[in-house]
């Protein structure tokens, strides 16, 4: 922390924090440091990754906890944990070697865009793949923590399995 402070002290002395955060110009060679594009880019990547990941994880957690046999969950849990243990550098390398060329070769031309593939979309897709194991584990544990009596009560009152999931399980979980 001390080294970081020493290296950035001149920057903090010459510019206000407001100017650093909200300036759109990034030219380090000429002494212009604007963090705004990086902040906005990070927000976009995060929002898109959550948009991609949320439905996949929610539907997978519902399927695994409500429709499949317990053996499927016992097999899937270690696999999900292994995916969660993969270093982010490996995911990033996979993104550069697979996702970026895919976007450049197929998605760009599909939409009439000439691109190298290095984009917010590529970053969001890689981030969404990275966070799937964590969100999926959380949702599975939430659904498993709901008392079985609630599900059985809804089913005994004549609700279908989907009605039970929609009206009881999801409302209790979320």
Where do the protein language model's features map onto the residues?
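Transmembrane alpha-helices
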Residues: 78, 82, 135-139, 146, ...
């Amino acid at each position: 922390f001390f080294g970081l402070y020493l290296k950035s002290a001149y920057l903090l002395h010459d510019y206000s924090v407001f100017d650093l955060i909200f300036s759109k110009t990034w030219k380090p060679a000429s002494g212009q440091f604007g963090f705004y594009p990086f902040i906005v880019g990070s927000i976009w990547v995060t929002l898109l990754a959550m948009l991609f990941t949320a439905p996949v994880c929610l539907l997978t957690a519902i399927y695994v906890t409500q429709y499949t046999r317990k053996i499927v969950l016992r097999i899937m849990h270690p696999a999900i944990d292994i995916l969660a243990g993969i270093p982010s550098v490996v995911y990033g390398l996979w993104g550069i070697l697979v996702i970026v060329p895919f976007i450049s070769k197929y998605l760009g031309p599909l939409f009439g865009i000439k691109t190298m593939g290095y984009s917010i979309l590529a970053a969001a897709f890689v981030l969404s793949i990275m966070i799937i194991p964590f969100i999926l584990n959380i949702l599975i544990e939430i659904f498993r923590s709901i008392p079985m009596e609630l599900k059985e009560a809804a089913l005994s009152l004549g609700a279908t399995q989907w009605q039970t999931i929609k009206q009881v399980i999801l409302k209790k979980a979320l």
